[in-house]
């Protein structure tokens, strides 16, 4: 063998040896994946279900006339706060956890999905007239039970408040209890307010809306019976959306009296406490439909009994939140516009057939639904104020108008390997959604 041939033989053997070594190294480096998702074979229970929501049972029942459906909101924290002016207002920094509408019997029963981190306190709020505005309860074993009815706070008879003698400033029709409930209510004049009346009032002067100008007026009502009969005048309490515990009263003056004479007229208290919402422990002494019969007070401030002569006008006033402030208030609202310090008209009035509605705007939001009353006379024709007529709500199930809207927004991320094991990056498909759900007036029972 020549030297050249020997070189090539050695070179070839070395080449094959090197290749063999490389193959062995590559094979020995191909070990299996040592990741063990079970943590080394130990069985550890995984109690985290990745859920951010929970399912609860919601049972709500309002004491309402048949056919009156109530739109309500459920919060897990107090939805009210006090603004710079000292008024209790609905918060704007939170949204309801649940918004629903009852059926025609005032009931709602359904499963609801809420955030898993909800607390135990529950606040149920509605702006609908004729029912309590705010009720606080709790959630127990994932169930909310709320049987909502007019619950008057305890009161004991008294002639005057602890530190305020109203008789030094105002005329009195009688005494009242510590919760502001008059001891002179007229049971014969009490009325169960119908669903049609309540719905018509709600639709005419809506919470959070702007009261149409046509209803705003100086709502001083004139007694004028064409047959000259003895006339009695009464006021029924309807309700309202005010957070204030206001004093409501009236005054009498002759038709054509000057502003000076009207201002000097003796002011009489009718309802010492018009609060019905139950905010911040304020007392409740009235419920919708309860009535007081007025007395005619002559120009000298003398009580002449319950018969009103023709030609007398009756004006109204509201002392904002004065019942819980010993008669003091920073806002007095009169139905006689000329008496209002801000120059504004603070009353709205309209009729539903023969049912005359008087409503106050007690501050500045212009919805004019804060406190509402029904003024009526016997004979009924004796008070026929020139106020707009409103068509009563028909109260039929054909009304399919939108009661409320709920908007859902979010982002969904998908893993396309599920349920097989994979990379779990959850970025294979990403969807951003915006869904608007409309609820009509009939309550959705099956969802």
Language-model segment annotations:
Residues 68-86, 243-269, 447:
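Extended low-complexity, serine/threonine- and proline-enriched intrinsically disordered segments
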Residues 439-446:
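Conserved small/polar residues in nucleotide/adenosyl-binding loops
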Residues 103-121, 292-312:
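Short Pro-Gly-centered beta-turn/loop motif in secreted/extracellular proteins
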Residues 118-130, 312-327, 332:
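A short, solvent-exposed beta-strand micro-motif common in secreted/extracellular proteins
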Residues 31-232, 380-415:
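Acidic/polar, low-complexity intrinsically disordered N-terminal segments immediately downstream
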Residues 129-157, 323-356, 431:
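Structured interaction patches on ligand/partner-binding surfaces of diverse proteins
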Residues 361-364:
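Short beta-strand-plus-loop segments that form exposed binding edges in beta-rich domains
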Residues 2-28:
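Sec-dependent bacterial lipoprotein signal peptides
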């Amino acid at each position: 063998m020549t030297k050249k041939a020997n070189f090539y033989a050695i070179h070839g053997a070395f080449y094959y040896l090197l290749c063999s070594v490389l193959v062995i190294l590559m094979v020995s480096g191909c070990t299996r994946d040592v990741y063990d998702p079970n943590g080394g074979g130990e069985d550890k229970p995984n109690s985290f279900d990745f859920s951010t929501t929970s399912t609860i049972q919601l049972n709500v029942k309002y004491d309402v006339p048949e056919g009156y459906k109530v739109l309500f909101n459920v919060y897990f924290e107090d939805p009210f706060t006090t603004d710079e002016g000292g008024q209790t207002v609905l918060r704007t920094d939170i949204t309801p956890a649940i918004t629903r509408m009852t059926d025609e019997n005032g009931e709602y029963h359904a499963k609801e999905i809420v955030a898993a981190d909800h607390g135990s306190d529950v606040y149920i709020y509605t702006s609908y007239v004729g029912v309590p505005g705010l009720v606080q309860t709790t959630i127990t074993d994932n169930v909310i039970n709320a049987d909502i009815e007019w619950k008057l706070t305890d009161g004991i008879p008294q002639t005057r408040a602890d530190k305020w003698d109203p008789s030094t400033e105002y005329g009195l029709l009688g005494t009242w209890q510590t919760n502001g409930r008059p001891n002179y209510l007229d049971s014969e004049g009490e009325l169960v307010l119908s669903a049609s009346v309540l719905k018509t009032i709600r639709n005419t002067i809506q919470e959070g809306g702007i009261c149409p100008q046509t209803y705003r007026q100086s709502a001083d009502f004139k007694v004028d019976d064409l047959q000259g009969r003895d006339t009695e005048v009464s006021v029924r309490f309807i309700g309202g959306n005010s957070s204030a515990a206001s004093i409501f009263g009236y005054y009498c003056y002759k038709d054509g009296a000057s502003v000076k004479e009207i201002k000097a007229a003796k002011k009489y208290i009718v309802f010492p406490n018009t609060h019905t919402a139950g905010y911040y422990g304020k007392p409740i002494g009235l419920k919708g439909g309860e009535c007081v019969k007025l007395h005619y007070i002559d120009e000298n401030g003398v009580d002449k009994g319950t018969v009103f002569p023709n030609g007398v006008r009756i004006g109204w006033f509201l002392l904002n939140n004065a019942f819980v402030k010993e008669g003091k208030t920073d806002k007095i609202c009169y139905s006689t516009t000329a008496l209002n310090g801000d120059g504004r008209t603070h009353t709205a009035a309209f009729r539903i057939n023969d049912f005359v509605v008087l409503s106050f705007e007690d501050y500045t939001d212009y919805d004019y639904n804060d406190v509402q009353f029904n003024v009526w006379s016997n004979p009924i024709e004796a008070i026929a104020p020139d106020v707009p007529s409103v068509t009563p709500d028909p109260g039929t199930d054909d009304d399919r108008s939108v009661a409320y809207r709920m908007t859902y927004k979010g982002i969904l991320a998908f893993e396309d390997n599920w349920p097989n094991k994979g990379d779990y990056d959850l970025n294979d498909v990403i969807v951003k959604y915006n869904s608007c759900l409309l609820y009509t007036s009939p309550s959705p029972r099956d969802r």
